[in-house]
Curated annotation (Swiss-Prot):
The gene is tpcC. CDD domains: PKS (cd00833). This is Atrochrysone carboxylic acid synthase. Residues 41-270 are annotated as: N-terminal acylcarrier protein transacylase domain (SAT). SMART domains: PKS_AT (SM00827), PKS_KS (SM00825), PKS_PP (SM00823). Residues 1335-1468 are annotated as: N-terminal hotdog fold. Keywords: Multifunctional enzyme, Phosphopantetheine, Phosphoprotein, Transferase. The lineage of its organism: Eukaryota, Fungi, Dikarya, Ascomycota, Pezizomycotina.
Length: 1782
């Protein structure tokens, strides 16, 4: 073969041009090959580098194919790899027998990958041609150059390059096999070099010395050492490593030389005595190279590294590869020949520039450049282009979209959670983390009785060995109506599934999700993925009462399925169980769905609510759980297992590019996620550090992350000795290795959330993820609190040296420019699965420079599904604004409109500043308008009518902000203007764009075209916002725009008619000779007072809205007459008098133009015709004749409206939108159809367009019109940001089925049989009776006609507690007398039926007396028991007696309430009440009259209960039965409707009793007849309570009562509450008593029993809630031990034989106390002599309480209410005060 002659002639077009030399080296970069491969991997995900990605994919496939063909021993050396780039992550492979193959592959991949990527970035620089381009390289670099030589374009390079990579791998295998036969690999794994470089030695001398040695030692030919490379300053010798070492020991010539081992460990090349052309062919030939032959030939010459000449012409790719491979295997490298060849060709080409392209500088490159610079003529520029830095350059901040979904990063855009210990949102969860709290506690009673189900000894069957866990407070709380669930369905639905849908909603809300707003939020492309590993509630709670919803409410699949169904998501819903790693494995599955393109947005998370004691027992016996009181002692030396935990969390994920396009807040970005299994562990539950390490490396590889860039690892950290030790081994090995340690500036922190909130099992992974997201947000690492003693001894001892840190206190974790925070999250399964994900901080998204929202007014909306929630949402928004005073109003408007789902109860505020917004929101709340707002119709959006304004209200010139700011509106205007100019009319844009002042008049053509075209554009703008008309009407000139919107006229034809008509007017009519005049009078009135004068009726707009036309003189005359009669007349600013005789000259020609030049279509909307006073539906009515008549004849707007209403084209619900410059037509609509409810303008004269539009949009929104808010904000979205506003305010109630008894312990065994009697005594008798207030019968006994029954109930049980909190006083739930009544009705009926079976009693609950309030304690986690007994000596006496007791620490306290039940006949009651009926009715009528006269006060429901709450009692909604109240002094009646809302099990629901009876309390605490600021009144009971018929839900009643002070005590009031239905007395609460107390005592009487009332702030005149009940016997609590206690009564000082007390200093506490006593008792100081007894001074028990409270409040002296009994005289008190407070 002849050499290829690439030398151009002197005439060649390449002469005097530049020359390019591309050099591929033979050494891998020594400074971070892994980092380079990671960067290349990252570039392959970038859409800008498809060729690079294809090259890597093709190369990976090629190497996979070659590995498959290896023999078994070699194949076993290669671990699985996903990408050829990942081979760099296997250092053991690079040191093994195949090191030559791996290094060759990586070298070619890096160099060719860099070459391709560089030129994809700069495609214009890819200018190579065969005449002036030369390729060369050393060793394998020469092989890489063949790919470039064969590729005519850059697009061809990936396929040719992949073949180079394949051949490089084969070459390494061949060399390894051949070299192994020359010297086997060292058994110890030590690597020896096969080549040494020796500087300053002549090649000939070296060769002669080697020949001598070989001859002397009879070295076999194949084992001889040889010269493999020659350079100007050195030679390289190669051979078997052992012989090389021997050479340097034995040869004097070589021993005395400097020699350097080269990193050549794979074997020999450049050895012609070993290899031949057959070896070269064996490496090259194969099916893949043959495929290249069909399309590739050598394009650019490659210079031989032996001769320096181009390789011979190759007609196929195979031939070129064989040339190169033969050279690599058999020829020594002589770089000087290459240099000489390049220099000679540069001279022959007479180039002006030589560019040398390299991949980093090197000695050969340096020598080449030096030779070029010294050898070429002066003026020839020699340049080097280093392509290597392209890989490591700083990338653009603006991230390009990924190559495909598989290369996307995953953005987390929303999150929500319910965590233990009151963490009902992420902020409260962060508080727990930040404060370093451990929130474990004893298993609460709403799960199961921990005392009976816990056995620390582990001997009791099915019992737990631990009593501890971490629990969500009140997991049964749920807003069932919001999620369209009935109370029964809610109660039977697993609470974790309920909380999952709640947190899903909140996460989506925080993510700004609105269905179908963008491509990624399309409901068809969204799915749900949740982890769940238990079914406690189904197995235990709802299994006790299996019914309709047992399966859909309890089975796992329904959790995510219900979320999909509620949100109408069409994508997949997965419930995944991988035990403890369920939620993170689920999130990985969700990421995979996003990467695969299966979905565009997912809601994912995990859930766990613990109610089944079996799981505690099973995990205890499996040695999983700690027995000690802690969350998890993660990394502690005494870690003994984990603490179980509740938790529910949801996150919203989408691909990063979608999140950025959607303008989302990005909380964090998932870079990679994977799951594997600890298959090699010693048991299925035992962790395996190797598997964990492998998983971490896999995630890092796929994400292209350097482990040293990870600064935080959230570890699984369950707190077991084995688990903690294995995990720290894997984490330290990967992220803080002992070798290649982290720099001191680059620590990695570790943490574990389980130390705070326990192990949530199925929710553990997402809990950890939420923690990391919060850390990103808060820029802090919270303290780790798991190490209670000392660190686990199994941890590496060199953590500090490795720079691996445990944060024992909160650490800053700030953003840093140019370096993202990256964290890893581990979540492992007891079943052996491991899941890990890598996550980095979300990108900062500042508003772009210059991006502004120019709108002057904004609309803020708030909505809810209930009025209670609406109020809560308003309050939350106000709180947010208070906390964020600098919030941008535009962002707030955008968030609340375009990024929120809108419910049926709506509030909208149009405003220009935050202060005004807050004022309007406060006004809405304070005025109670929330309760009067009407929700939007459930039947769908209202019909919409567009009314197009005529010319009478138009400006002369406009300055439309909408034209300036709205691209859509502007484009419509400009398009219409183009149409107008195309028809020869002048541009009308100057008339609307602010070019002229408003009083500048334009010619009629411009004026009329401007009006009609603006209205057309405005109507289309409304339609673009989703406000689409169902019917149109146009007034006069406005009818042309209306006909276009209805489809009758094209825009071009409408412009033609308007423009031509205006031209005719200018030509045929005299401007201003005639006038149009609006008159505020009816037709009859005008006829009556001006009928004698000439005028024409131009418009009949309403009953009293007329427009007259005529000459100027005629109009002036008419105006004088009408104004004289008091009618308002306004001359319209129009040039012509339309609809009058002035139009006659143009009519014929105008009709002809319309007939010949215009196409009239059938309307696609009903058109209300003011000309015809009818609605047009057909295609024949509107034609050229119609247009003529409409110009000349009267506009009958009034009759047109009435006709349209009559035939139901419009109705009262129709929403009217005025399309025009000022609201005119909508006023006509209102006057014509007064029942019309909603009318809005588009523009208003003198008002900024945005002010008008936002106000109108708010009205439409509240009317139920579905506005496209996204479209409204879209032009300004670059300047807008989504705010993280408070989430929805739920109207929650408790839905919970309580696990009863101990059957989980006893099932299937006899272990507890012997304990049965004892258990029965403790747990109560089996009984069919169980209500919300009578929960457990603990004793019952019957003997003939005598009987007794005793029950115990826990006030902390959800329904009972809710009932108490339904009646709040002083901020606390109080057991109201109505609850006591329900208990009495229940036990009374039960006892009666036991003694008189099959009989139905009518009961009178009589003589109820409550001597001490029963107040709900603050600690809801421990029981608060009461015991009530009912007994009768003889049921035939028809009475039973009841007593109430508190049960404290198992002991029964003195009774605090009592009552008697009389069994009577309802007929007797009705008969006794009948005579009083007319008296009661008479008083009611009298009160009604007083109210009408303004003497009595009438209150709405909201007002009444608002006053009640501000005075004393805050009732829950169910208790608020009074719909209205009429009150005069101490007498009132109320109309009552009982709620239909269900909840709880009752005999007579307390909220029914209270609703019909608490009118008496309302009088006593609201009436201005009492001093309610200073006092409050509570009831200790009544004489009788009787209901002749059951109180029924939804029924209407009327209550009446008059309260009268008693003669004996003016602080006690009595009254009879009559309950009427249909004017018949059906019930009565007789002798109801109220006692008045000073308000200062409210806090003392109504504080939680487990709180020190005297340390809390005294109640003001507007107390918070608490239970009523006290009488004069109410007792204060004893003083705490820390206060100065009074001596025992036996030692109390007395006045007998005791000296007078020393006189205190005037400023002393004692003196102030005595002065206070005098003030409060109304005494003089002189009355308070030391010998005076307090009883003689009139200080009774009530006054004692008041003074005691004043002591505490004013002086800080804490005493009991019995102070004046213990110190009965003034002297006694002085002495005690001086002793303790002087």
């Amino acid at each position: 073969m002849r050499p290829v002659d690439f030398t151009p002639s002197s005439e060649s077009p390449t002469a005097e041009k530049g020359m390019k030399v591309v050099y591929f080296g033979n050494e891998l970069p020594q400074d971070g090959i892994q980092g380079i491969c990671r960067r290349l991997h990252t570039y392959t995900k970038d859409r800008r580098y498809p060729l690079l990605a294809r090259f890597i994919e093709e190369s990976t496939w090629a190497v996979h194919d070659e590995v498959r063909q290896l023999h078994a021993a070699q194949k076993a050396l290669v671990s699985p790899f996903e990408s050829v780039l990942h081979l760099a992550e296997q250092p053991e492979l690079c040191r093994g027998p195949l090191c030559g193959s791996i290094e060759g592959v990586l070298l070619c991949v890096i160099q060719l990958g860099t070459f391709i990527g560089y030129y994809e970035d700069s495609p214009n620089e890819y200018t190579f041609d065969s005449a002036n381009t030369y390729l060369t390289g050393l060793g394998l670099g020469l092989l890489a150059s063949t790919a470039v030589s064969l590729s005519p374009t850059l697009a061809d390079l990936p396929l040719a390059g992949a073949e180079v990579v394949r051949v490089a791998f084969r070459l390494g295998v061949l060399v390894a096999d051949v070299s192994q036969n020359l010297q086997p690999a060292d058994a110890t794994g030590e690597r020896d070099s096969w080549a040494y470089v020796i500087p300053n030695v002549a090649p000939k001398e070296a060769e002669e010395e080697l020949a001598v040695i070989h001859t002397r030692e009879n070295t076999p030919e194949a084992s001889r050492i040889f010269i493999s490379a020659i350079s100007r300053t050195s030679v390289t010798i190669s051979g078997p490593p052992a012989r090389l070492r021997r050479l340097f020991r034995m040869s004097d010539f070589f021993r005395d030389r400097t020699f350097v081992a080269l990193p050549v460990y794979g074997g020999l090349c450049h050895a012609k005595h070993i290899y031949n052309s057959q070896h070269a062919r064996s490496v090259v030939q194969g099916p893949s190279i043959a495929a290249l032959d069909t399309r590739f030939i050598a394009r650019y010459p490659i210079l031989s590294t032996g001769s320096g000449e181009p390789f011979p012409t190759a007609t196929t790719a195979t031939e070129l590869f064989e040339h190169v491979m033969t050279e690599i295997l058999t020829q020594a490298i002589e770089w000087e020949n290459v240099i000489q060849g390049v220099v000679e060709r540069a001279k022959l080409l007479s180039v002006s520039e030589v560019q040398v392209q390299v991949f980093r500088n090197s000695h050969p490159v340096h020598d080449l450049l030096s030779a070029l610079e010294t050898s070429l003529r002066e003026g020839v520029e020699v340049a080097i282009k280093d392509l290597g830095p392209w890989i490591t350059r700083t990338r653009d901040e603006e991230r390009p979209p990924p190559r495909g979904t598989a290369q996307s990063k995953i953005a987390i855009v929303g999150m929500s959670c319910r965590m233990p210990s009151g963490a009902t949102d992420t902020e409260k969860f962060w508080d727990i983390l930040e404060q370093g709290l451990d929130v474990h506690r004893k298993i609460p009673p709403d799960r199961f009785d921990v005392d009976s189900h816990y056995d620390p000894a582990g001997k009791r069957v099915n019992a737990s060995h631990t009593p501890y866990g971490c629990f969500i407070d009140e997991p049964g709380l749920f807003d069932a109506p919001f999620f369209n669930m009935s109370p029964r369905e809610a109660q039977q639905t697993d609470p974790m599934q309920r909380l999952a849908i709640v947190t899903a909603y909140e996460a989506l809300e925080r993510a700004g999700y609105v269905a179908n707003r963008t491509r990624s939020s399309n409901k068809h492309r969204m799915g749900t993925f949740y982890g769940q590993a238990s079914d406690d509630y189904r197995e235990v709670n709802s299994a006790q009462e299996i019914s309709t919803y047992f399966i859909p409410g309890g089975c796992r699949a329904f959790g995510p399925g219900r979320i999909n169904y509620f949100f109408k998501l069409w994508g997949p819903s997965f419930s995944i169980d991988t035990a403890c790693s369920s939620s993170l494995a689920t999130i990985q599955a969700a990421c995979t769905a996003l990467w695969n393109g299966d979905t565009d947005t997912v809601v994912a998370g995990g859930m766990n609510v613990l109610t089944n004691s079996d799981a505690f027992a099973g995990l205890s016996h499996g040695h999983f759980l700690t027995k000690t009181p802690n969350a998890c002692k993660t990394w502690d030396c005494e870690a003994d297992g984990y603490c179980r935990a509740d938790g529910v969390a949801s996150i919203v994920m989408k691909r990063l590019e979608d999140a950025e396009a959607d303008n989302d807040n990005i909380l964090g970005v998932i870079l990679g996620a994977a799951t594997n299994h600890s298959a090699e562990a010693i048991s299925i539950t035992h962790p395996h550090a190797g598997a964990q390490s492998c998983l971490s490396r896999q995630v890092l590889r796929s994400a292209g992350i350097d482990p040293m860039d990870v600064s935080y690892v959230e570890m699984h950290g369950t707190g077991t000795q084995a688990g903690d030790a294995e995990e720290i081994k894997s984490v330290s090995d990967v992220f803080a290795p002992a070798v290649k340690r982290r720099s001191s500036q680059q620590p990695v922190f570790i943490g574990a959330v389980k130390a705070n909130v326990g192990h949530g099992e199925a929710v553990a992974g997402v809990t950890a993820l939420v923690k990391v997201l919060l850390m990103f947000q808060k820029e802090a690492i919270p303290p780790h609190v798991g190490i209670k003693n000392s660190i686990n001894p199994g941890f590496p001892k060199d953590l500090d040296q490795r720079n691996l840190r445990i944060p024992y206190e909160k650490k800053p974790w700030p953003r840093r420019p140019g370096r993202k925070r990256i964290a890893m999250v581990n979540n492992f399964s007891a079943a052996g699965g491991n899941s890990t994900l890598a996550i980095e901080e979300g990108p900062l998204r500042p508003k772009p420079a210059g991006a502004i929202d120019p709108r002057s007014s904004h609309l803020v909306t708030v909505s809810a599904k209930s009025k209670i929630s609406l109020k809560g949402n308003l309050e939350r928004l106000l709180s947010f604004l208070d906390a964020h005073p600098d919030v941008a109003l535009s962002d707030l408007a955008y968030t609340t409109t375009a990024r929120r789902h809108h419910h049926n109860h709506r509030v909208a505020v149009a405003t220009s500043d935050i202060a005004d917004l807050k004022a309007q929101l406060c006004k809405t709340l304070e005025s109670d308008s929330v309760n009067t707002l009407q929700p939007i119709s459930a039947t769908g959006p209202p019909p919409i009518a567009f009314a197009f304004t005529g010319q009478g209200s138009s400006y002369k010139s406009w300055d439309l902000q909408l034209f300036q700011h709205s691209p859509y509106f502007r484009s419509q205007i400009l398009h219409l203007d183009t149409l107008a100019q195309g028809q020869g009319f002048p541009s009308f844009v100057p008339a609307i764009d602010g070019s002229y002042p408003r009083d500048h008049a334009h010619c009629p053509v411009i004026t009329q075209l401007a009006l009609v075209c603006t209205e057309i554009a405005l109507a289309k703008y409304w339609v673009s916002l989703g406000v689409t008309p169902d019917v149109v009407v146009g007034h006069s000139l406005g009818e042309y725009a209306a006909l276009h919107i209805a489809g009758v006229l094209s825009a071009s034809d409408a412009i033609f008619l308007v423009g031509q008509r205006a031209c005719l007017l200018q030509e045929r009519c005299q401007p201003s000779s005639h006038q149009m005049m609006a008159v505020r009078a009816s037709l009859e009135q005008i006829e009556q007072f001006a009928g004698s004068l000439p005028y024409e009726i131009a418009c009949v707009n309403g009953p009293r809205e007329m427009v007259l036309s005529g000459t100027r003189e005629e109009m002036a005359a008419v105006a004088r007459l009408l104004e004289a009669e008091g009618f308002k007349c306004i001359v319209l600013e129009v040039a012509f008098a339309f609809h009058s005789a002035q139009m006659d000259p143009i009519l014929d020609e105008f009709e002809a133009l319309a007939a010949s030049g215009v196409v009239f279509q059938a309307p696609n909307l009903p058109v209300i015709s003011p000309l015809l006073s009818k609605v047009v539906f057909d295609e024949h009515t509107i034609d050229s004749v119609y247009m003529r008549r409409a110009t000349r004849e009267t506009v009958h707007f009034l009759s047109a409206m009435k006709m349209a209403h009559k035939i139901s084209t419009i109705d009262d619900a129709t929403v009217w939108v005025e399309i025009g410059p000022h609201p005119v037509c909508v006023n006509f609509v209102r006057s014509s159809l007064p029942s019309t409810s909603v009318t809005v303008p588009s523009f208003r004269r003198g008002e900024d367009n945005w002010v008008t539009l936002t106000s109108s949009l708010g009205i439409l929104h509240c009317a139920g019109v579905p506005v496209d808010w996204n479209e409204f904000h879209q032009p300004f979205e670059r300047a807008l940001r989504l705010l993280d506003l408070p989430t929805y305010s739920w109207n929650e109630k408790t839905y919970w089925i309580q696990y009863q008894g101990n059957w989980a312990l006893t099932k299937g065994n006899t272990f507890y049989d012997d304990e049965a009697p004892q258990t029965k005594a403790l747990a109560g008798l089996a009984s069919e009776l169980r209500t919300s207030t009578v929960q457990q019968i603990i004793h019952e006994q019957y003997d003939g006609a005598a009987g007794s029954v005793v029950m115990q109930s826990d006030l902390m049980q959800p329904d009972f507690l809710a009932a108490a909190y339904g009646h709040k006083m002083n901020g606390r739930g109080v057991v109201t007398s109505s609850i006591h009544a329900d208990i009495a009705f229940t036990l009374g009926e039960y006892l009666y039926k036991k003694l008189n079976p099959n009989q139905e009693p009518h009961m009178n609950i009589a003589n109820l007396e409550v001597v001490k309030a029963l107040v709900a304690q603050e600690n809801t986690k421990s029981p608060q028991l009461i015991q009530v007994s009912a007994s009768t000596d003889n049921i035939r006496s028809r009475q039973a007696h009841l007593k109430w007791h508190n049960v404290i620490n198992g002991s029964i306290e003195e009774p605090f309430a009592s009552a008697t039940v009389y069994y009577e006949e309802a007929s007797d009651w009705l008969a006794s009440w009948r005579p009083a009926t007319h008296l009661v009715q008479g008083r009611i009528h009298a009160l009604e009259q007083l109210a009408e006269d303004g003497v009595a006060n009438r209150f709405t429901r909201r007002m009444a209960y608002g006053l009640f709450a501000s005075s004393l009692v805050d009732y829950a909604d169910k208790y608020r039965g009074m719909q209205s109240v009429v009150l005069h002094e101490l007498e009132a009646f109320a109309d009552v409707v009982l709620t239909t809302e269900k909840g709880g099990t009752w005999t007579v629901p307390p909220y029914f009793i209270d609703s019909v009876a608490h009118l008496a309390g309302f009088i006593m605490n609201v009436s201005d007849a009492n001093d309610t600021n200073a006092n409050f009144c509570v009831t200790p009971g009544w004489s009788s309570m009787r209901f002749a018929a059951p109180l029924l839900p939804g029924s209407k009643y009327r209550s009446y009562v008059k309260m009268i002070p008693t003669v004996e005590d003016n602080n006690i009031y009595l009254g009879d509450v009559y309950i009427l239905q249909d004017e018949t007395i059906v019930g009565m609460v007789g002798g109801i008593k109220f006692r008045r107390y000073p308000r200062i005592l409210l806090n003392r009487f109504f504080s939680a029993p487990d709180a020190d009332a005297r340390k809390s702030t005294p109640a003001t005149s507007a107390p918070a809630p608490a239970p009523p009940a006290g009488s004069e016997a109410l007792q204060p609590k004893a003083a705490p031990a820390s206060t100065p206690a009074a001596p025992a009564s036996a030692d109390a000082p007395t006045t007998n034989g005791v000296k007078a007390a020393a006189e205190p200093d005037a400023n002393s506490t004692a003196a102030k106390a005595i002065a206070l006593v005098a003030t409060e008792a109304g005494l003089g100081l002189s009355d308070l002599k030391d010998s005076a007894s307090f009883s003689s001074l009139g200080i009774d028990s009530l006054m004692s309480l008041v003074i005691s409270e004043k002591f505490r409040e004013t002086l800080g002296v804490t005493v009991t209410g019995s102070l004046f009994l213990e110190y009965p005289t003034v002297g006694d008190l002085k002495s005690w005060l001086l002793e303790y407070y002087s």
